[in-house]
Amino acid sequence: MAVKNKVSNGNLKGGNVKTDGVKEVHYRGVRKRPWGRYAAEIRDPGKKSRVWLGTFDTAEEAAKAYDTAAREFRGPKAKTNFPSPTENQSPSHSSTVESSSGENGVHAPPHAPLELDLTRRLGSVAADGGDNCRRSGEVGYPIFHQQPTVAVLPNGQPVLLFDSLWRAGVVNRPQPYHVTPMGFNGVNAGVGPTVSDSSSAVEENQYDGKRGIDLDLNLAPPMEF
């Protein structure tokens, strides 16, 4: 924006400027006529000649006419008296447009809420047997929401009964096995499971129970026991 302050009705005396009048603004490509009107003209860069734009009542009107012609000749990089209408738009204008579009019903899709309850998330994986986990690529650990049944042997050792877990699909059922009698010291002590070759390996804590001792209370105790 080329604006110069020009002193009207100024008198030069001894190299000093005597300001009798009022300062007025001088615009690029605008000249003031002696009768008070303002003429606007611009140089055509192609023809290397001046182009007459007209005479206007105010300097601002003449300056705007020059700016319009300058943008036509030199494009957006032309030197003008006033900024272009696009440059006048402040950054808040775009934000105002976005906010108004949001009020009209155009909203961005909301983000899915973040799951913070890991117990519930992993529990759902245990309930479906890990199928969803394998499909989605997630890694989960089985959470036993249903407490397994606990039994206690005569020696006080607890035993977990996995039947309740098999029903929920958390633990895979083992293959059927055969039961054969087992002899101990010539006495049929009971039956014991014999896992077949096709069955899955299940580690079981086997307990022999109390070992029977053949003693005669009428006789003296042995020397070594």
Curated annotation (Swiss-Prot):
Q: Where in the cell is it found?
A: Nucleus
Instruction: Check the record and name the InterPro entries matching this protein.
Output: AP2/ERF_dom (IPR001471), AP2/ERF_dom_sf (IPR036955), DNA-bd_dom_sf (IPR016177)
Tissue-level expression reads:
Expressed in roots, in cultured cells and at low levels in buds and leaves. Highly expressed in cell culture, especially during the exponential phase.
PTM section of the record:
Probably negatively regulated by UBC2, that targets it to the ubiquitin proteasome pathway after ubiquitination and leads it to proteolysis.
Query: Which stretches are labeled DNA-binding?
Result: 26-83
Query: Where do the segments described as Interaction with UBC2 lie?
Result: 92-196
Query: Where, by residue number, is the motif EAR-like (transcriptional repression)?
Result: 215-221
Disulphide bridges: none
Protein origin, superkingdom: Eukaryota
The residue ranges flagged as biased composition, category Low complexity, are 90-101
Q: Tell me if Repressor is a UniProt keyword of this record.
A: yes
Q: Give the residue ranges for region: Disordered.
A: 1-25, 67-112
UniProt lists compositionally biased (Polar residues) regions at 1-11
What triggers its expression? Strongly induced by ethephon (ethylene-releasing compound) in buds and to lower extent in leaves. Strongly induced by cycloheximide and mechanical stimuli. Wounding leads to a both local and systemical transient expression, independently of ethylene, and through a de-novo-protein-synthesis-independent regulation. Not influenced by methyl-jasmonate. Induction by purified xylanase from Trichoderma viride (TvX) and another elicitor from Phytophthora infestans (PiE), that appears to be mediated by a protein kinase cascade, and to be negatively regulated by protein phosphatases.
Does Protease count among this protein's keywords? Answer: no
Any idea which GO molecular function terms this record carries? Answer: DNA binding; DNA-binding transcription factor activity
Q: Which Pfam families match?
A: AP2
Keywords, comma-separated and alphabetical: DNA-binding, Ethylene signaling pathway, Nucleus, Plant defense, Repressor, Transcription, Transcription regulation, Ubl conjugation
What's any one GO cellular component for it?
nucleus
Record text on subunit structure and interactions: Interacts with UBC2.
Read off the domain note: The AP2/ERF domain binds specifically to the 5'-GCCGCC-3' motif. The affinity of this binding is higher if the seventh amino-acid of this domain is basic. Contains a slightly degenerated ERF-associated amphiphilic repression (EAR) motif, which may be involved in the activity of transcriptional repression.
Family under the similarity heading? Belongs to the ethylene-response factor family. Class 2 subfamily.
Question: What role does this protein play?
Answer: Acts as a transcriptional repressor. Binds to the GCC-box pathogenesis-related promoter element. Involved in the regulation of gene expression by stress factors and by components of stress signal transduction pathways mediated by ethylene, that seems to depend on a protein kinase/phosphatase cascade, and to be influenced by methyl-jasmonate. May regulate other AtERFs.
Entry protein name? Ethylene-responsive transcription factor 4
Q: Which organism is it from?
A: Nicotiana tabacum (Common tobacco)
What gene makes this protein? ERF4
